[in-house]
C-alpha cells in the first residue's frame, strides 16, 4: 500500500489547486491516517484559502488532524467562512500576537477584524498590543474599525521623541490614550528604565484598562 499511493499522490499534487475536493477526499479515504493523505489534504486547504475558495476546502477539513501553525490558521479561515462561531475564540493568540506569523494567520486576523463577532473591547486589546509593539500601520487599520482615527504623522513624531511627547501628552480621548500607549512602547524600546519611571505619571487619570495596557 505504501508504495501504491505515491504515483497517485504526485498526480494529485502536481496541480493541487485545480483538483475538485472529491479527489482529495477520495485519496484520504483510501489511505486513512497516512502521512501523505494528511499532507495532501492540508496543502489543498492552504492552496484553496489563498484563492479564497473556502467552499472547496470545507469537505477536506476532516482529514487533517495534525496541522502546523500555517495549516491551522488556513483551516480556521475555512471554519469561520462556514459560520463556525467558536473559531475566533480559539484563535485569540493570533488576534493579539504582534510577532511575525504565517500569511494564513495574518489573513485570519484580518477576517476577525471585519467580523461582527469581535467586540469593541476585543478590537481595543488588539489595537493596544499593536501600539505597544510599534506596528503603526496595523494599529491605524485596527483603530478605524472602532471609529478612531489615528494619524501616521503623529505616530511618527512620537516615535522620534517619545519622552518629549509624554511630558505634555493629553489623556482625555481614546485616541489620546492610544498615543500614550504608543509613546511608552517606543520609550521602552530605547530606554526601559526611563519608560518605567515615566509610566506612573503617564497612567495618572486614565481609565483602569488603559493603565493596564500602559504597564
What are these regions (language model features)?
Residues 1-215:
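Alpha-helical solenoid repeat scaffolds
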Amino acid at each position: 500500500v505504501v508504495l501504491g499511493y505515491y504515483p497517485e499522490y504526485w498526480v494529485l499534487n502536481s496541480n493541487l489547486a485545480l483538483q475538485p475536493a472529491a479527489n482529495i477526499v477520495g485519496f484520504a479515504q483510501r489511505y486513512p491516517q497516512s502521512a501523505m493523505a494528511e499532507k495532501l489534504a492540508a496543502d489543498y486547504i492552504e492552496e484553496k484559502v489563498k484563492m479564497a475558495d473556502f467552499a472547496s476546502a470545507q469537505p477536506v477539513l476532516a482529514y487533517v488532524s495534525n496541522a502546523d501553525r500555517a495549516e491551522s490558521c488556513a483551516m480556521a479561515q475555512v471554519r469561520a467562512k462556514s459560520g463556525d462561531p467558536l473559531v475566533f475564540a480559539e484563535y485569540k493568540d493570533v488576534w493579539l500576537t504582534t510577532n511575525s506569523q504565517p500569511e494564513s494567520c495574518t489573513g485570519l486576523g484580518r477576517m476577525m477584524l471585519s467580523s461582527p463577532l469581535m467586540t469593541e473591547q476585543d478590537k481595543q486589546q488588539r489595537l493596544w498590543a499593536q501600539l505597544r509593539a510599534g506596528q503603526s500601520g496595523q494599529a491605524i487599520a485596527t483603530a478605524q474599525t472602532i471609529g478612531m482615527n489615528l494619524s501616521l504623522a503623529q505616530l511618527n513624531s512620537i516615535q522620534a521623541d517619545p519622552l518629549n511627547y509624554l511630558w505634555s501628552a493629553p489623556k482625555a480621548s481614546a485616541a489620546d490614550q492610544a498615543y500614550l500607549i504608543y509613546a511608552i512602547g517606543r520609550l521602552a524600546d530605547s530606554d526601559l528604565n526611563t519608560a518605567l519611571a515615566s509610566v506612573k505619571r503617564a497612567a495618572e487619570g486614565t481609565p483602569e484598562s488603559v493603565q493596564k495596557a500602559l504597564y
